[in-house]
Amino acid sequence: QAGVALAHQRLSILDLSPLGHQPMRSADSRYVLAYNGEIYNFAQLRAALAALGHRFRGHSDTEVLLAAVVEWGLDDTLARCNGMFALALWDERDHCLSLARDRVGKKPLYYGWAGDTLVFGSELKALWQHPDFDNGVDRHALTLLLRLGYIPAPACIHERTFKLMPGRVLRLDAQAVAAGAAAHRPDQAQQPFWNAREAMQRALAAPFTGTDAQAEEQLDSVLRDAVALRMVADVPVGVFLSGGTDSSIVTAMMQAQSDQPVHTFSIGFEGSHHDEAPLAREVATHLHTDHTELYVSGADALAVVPTLPDMFDEPFACCLLYTSPSPRDQRGS
């Protein structure tokens, strides 16, 4: 009746049962949510909502997110969320669609026009499926790509198409969009729920005054908490290990908090001085992880080139091509 449709293809991480399926309707039937990502602190939010009288059928973070919107509203909910997400929330009562993207934009959110229809998705491939989406290449976006190696938000490789800015909410009234009131620039209606500059200014106003030892202790605590939150899943969890400082620390913290060997994955390059696989192997051996290596040749890399448009949606200067097939093959075996 409102001319709005939500669809979702789920990558199941939490609550693999049908109770976690999306799009999901809130308990009061006012809201319908489809989102890509994960709310890492959903357990804490769930406990707070349960104390306020909310009841849950399953244990997915999607259900918690919906209950939070019912209790606190979307803006306050997003301010409380620790996670990565691109979401679409339909308000059945007010006939308003809200699109939101996480603070630093880990998850993309594309939206634009297919003829006179507003379309959106966390991948450009979703927009391409609309029969009226035939938007050509945006020349300004192409210029940004050649200069920066990627296309920053709000620009998009397609004309009349945009990426939602990180930390923003876009609210669209269904009647206004249907009447063309958005004038093909709905991005002008974006509102920030988080601002990096303001966060930096707050940090500068209250600088850390402890000792070096206290700083190390606090950093260790923050990192361990961050890793623990990301390990919550109803499916096996793995980690990409290069042998460098960052991935080695994350792997060590994962293994310290796991009662089973952590699945680690690394890639190597035959006959190359860039090969870090031996370093990763040493770390994996030291930590007693379940380690998998994938060696890549020049021919392997060339064979991937035809699949790049499907991988990236937009043109993107990135060489991390073989980090995903290895865990996928491991899961299949």
Language-model features, listed with the residues they occupy:
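Single conserved hydrophobic/aromatic residue that forms the stacking wall/gate
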Residues: Y322-P325, D329-S333
